[in-house]
Amino acid sequence: MVYSSGSWRDAYKGMSSDNVKGLVLALSSSIFIGASFIVKKKGLKKAGASGLRAGSGGYSYLLEPLWWIGMITMIVGEIANFAAYAFAPAILVTPLGALSIIISASLAHIILQEKLHTFGILGCALCIVGSVTIVLHAPQEQDIVSVLEVWNLATEPAFLFYAAAVVGAAIVLIVQFIPLYGQSHVMVYIGVCSLIGSLSVMSVKALGIALKLTFSGTNQLGYPQTWVFTVIVLFCVITQMNYLNKALDTFNTAVVSPIYYVMFTSLTILASVIMFKDWDRQSGTQIMTELCGFVTILSGTFLLHTTTDMVDGESKGNLSSEEDSHLLLRIPKHSEDSNGFVQDGIILSLRRQESAKSPRPARQNKQLEDDLEAVPLRRQESSLRS
């Protein structure tokens, strides 16, 4: 496809004033939301120490002031995010959540001692590059003069089909998969958050447009569609927060944040393209550049996820001597504890710090070998008695 110089300049004529306002609001939103992840995680840990953890179905965190501070911080960020959607298209606003990933991963490394690998830092850089690429090629916000226009877009067959598919998938995850895999697979909780979140963003954008028009002198509060969007926003946000709390309480923050960002952003962009037809106002070059930027973000989040697993593996296998490695190879790994391996009721602690500081005495090694050799004999005696 060939473009004239005039059409090329039109395609890259720069950001409108509304897009700039949306950009500033989205950046400030990411800062607040990224910090709120850490504050809420601290509150969840503190509440879980004295009550039933959120990941196990408990709600003791509702009585924890630190969790509420994190929640208020997140609400401030969400308000800024809400306002950003009223001024700019979702394709511009949503990818800037990459900044919240960087903030939450960095603070988790500093405050929560959740180690961030060197390649994780590279992943953060890729997230920034991808976000900047998308921002520079984002579509201009279309001119909407009434909430009825948004309602007409939301009730077109294509978006109704998408909404039905999202709700159906979320119900299947909640009913079938969460009871079985919620505590072991991070994608289950985050899947519910992301699916419902894509609908909440579309409703938030509709409500934001209605309020913006109302404040500018064109009252939209008299339309029932405005209140329908309000109810949808409330329902979706409550659902998102519930399952996001479970994900944060169950899994590492440095893992939850990037995966949630990728899924949420992908589904939100898809919903925006279907409902608001953002790509209809762009050239093929711009669309491909946006997709390349998004793939760059995906690469960054993949690095963050992968290097977190590498750090966990290093911390669990960090033994100082060849004898330690030899002994561990002789232990059938039936189940794994957070600090060691469990075999026939005997917990063999790795004691990473002690082994790193000084070698184990020969007498201690001999005693450990004797204990290991005695395990099969104990099992035989137990079977004979039974």
Swiss-Prot record:
Residues 40-61, 104-115, 179-189, 242-255, 305-386 are cytoplasmic. One of its GO terms (biological process) is magnesium ion transport. It is found in: Cell membrane; Early endosome. Residues 1-18, 137-157, 211-220, 277-283 are extracellular. Keywords: Cell membrane, Endosome, Ion transport, Magnesium, Membrane, Transmembrane, Transmembrane helix, Transport. It is a multi-pass membrane protein. Its main location: membrane. The chain crosses the membrane at residues 19-39, 62-82, 83-103, 116-136, 158-178, 190-210, 221-241, 256-276, 284-304. GO terms for cellular component: early endosome; plasma membrane. Pfam families: Mg_trans_NIPA. Residues 352-386 are annotated as: Disordered. Acts as a Mg(2+) transporter. Can also transport other divalent cations such as Fe(2+), Sr(2+), Ba(2+), Mn(2+) and Co(2+) but to a much less extent than Mg(2+). Homodimer. Belongs to the NIPA (TC 2.A.7) family. This is Probable magnesium transporter NIPA5. It comes from Arabidopsis thaliana (Mouse-ear cress).
